[in-house]
Curated annotation (Swiss-Prot):
The gene is SHE2. The lineage of its organism: Eukaryota, Fungi, Dikarya, Ascomycota, Saccharomycotina. The keyword ATP-binding does not apply. Belongs to the SHE2 family. The keyword Nucleus applies. This is SWI5-dependent HO expression protein 2. It comes from Kluyveromyces lactis (strain ATCC 8585 / CBS 2359 / DSM 70799 / NBRC 1267 / NRRL Y-1140 / WM37) (Yeast). GO terms for cellular component: cytoplasm; nucleus. It is found in: Cytoplasm; Nucleus. Homodimer and homotetramer. GO terms for biological process: mRNA transport. RNA-binding protein that binds specific mRNAs including the ASH1 mRNA, coding for a repressor of the HO endonuclease. Part of the mRNA localization machinery that restricts accumulation of certain proteins to the bud and in the daughter cell. GO terms for molecular function: RNA binding. Keywords: Cytoplasm, mRNA transport, Nucleus, RNA-binding, Transport. It comes from the Eukaryota.
């Protein structure tokens, strides 16, 4: 197996924590968004089950966002000069765990819950908008690719590390192979290979680049979340007599 020859430095640790902060903020956006939706559902008695389910997701996501927000590297000075996987592997494994839950949440709010809400209330304004669904799915793919890059840019793929396997990446590759898709010609970001970094400056620059890309996607999602939340809030305001 090929490994990145770059070792841990103070600059790398700082850049990694910046990336972690971006992921933490991303999860926090979901928490705020879901809380707004829960507030609306509280006024509709027929959506009791949907509300309880979202509350469960919110509690779990809030905990995970807090864990990422407080992520640190104990014994930082002792880590300097050691291999990158000592700090990247645990982080990658935790992010994968978080995004497996987020995958289930995305499916729930964009499909089953959406259908049930419309069926029970006959109101399409009490659900996640079509535009937001597109953004959620697109952002999720980009954030997953960021995790893949974080893990695979320091060592080539290894089937002996199931805790670092990304289901969406594996499934997309499997389907592409079955369909005889040329990976090198595909525009699907999930099929694009990740190159192992060779020098510290390159790794730090790429960490910053990924942080910038993810912040941009997060901003797009935040705007749509805000539009949905405003629409929901307007529907729950009492009518003035």
């Amino acid at each position: 197996m090929a490994y990145c020859q770059v070792v841990i430095s103070k600059e790398i640790l700082d850049a990694v924590l910046q990336l972690v902060s971006t992921y933490s903020n991303y999860i926090s956006r979901y928490v705020d968004y879901l809380n707004n939706l829960i507030a609306v559902q509280r006024r509709v008695s027929t959506l009791r089950f949907e509300r309880m389910t979202l509350i469960k997701y919110v509690k779990k996501l809030r905990f995970m966002a807090d864990v990422l927000h407080s992520w640190s590297f104990e014994g930082e000075n002792d880590l300097i000069g050691k291999r990158l996987n000592e700090v990247i592997d645990p982080l990658g494994a935790y992010l994968i765990k978080v995004f497996e839950i987020l995958d289930l949440l995305n499916f729930y709010i964009t499909q089953p819950m959406r259908g049930e809400t419309i069926s029970k209330t006959l109101n399409e304004d009490l659900v996640v908008s079509e535009e937001t669904i597109v953004c959620i799915n697109d952002s999720y793919r980009i954030y997953i690719k960021g995790i893949q890059w974080l893990v695979e840019s320091i060592s080539e793929r290894n089937g002996n590390c199931p805790h670092l396997a990304l289901e969406l990446i594996e499934f997309t590759r499997k389907c592409a192979i079955e369909d005889e898709v040329d990976f090198t010609a595909s525009e699907d970001i999930l099929l694009q290979d990740v190159a192992i970094v060779e020098v510290e400056e390159e790794y730090v620059d790429l960490l910053h680049d990924w942080s910038a890309i993810l912040v941009q996607k997060q901003t797009e999602m935040k705007e749509l979340f805000s539009e949905d939340s405003k629409r929901w809030a307007s529907m729950t305001k009492p009518v003035k007599k």
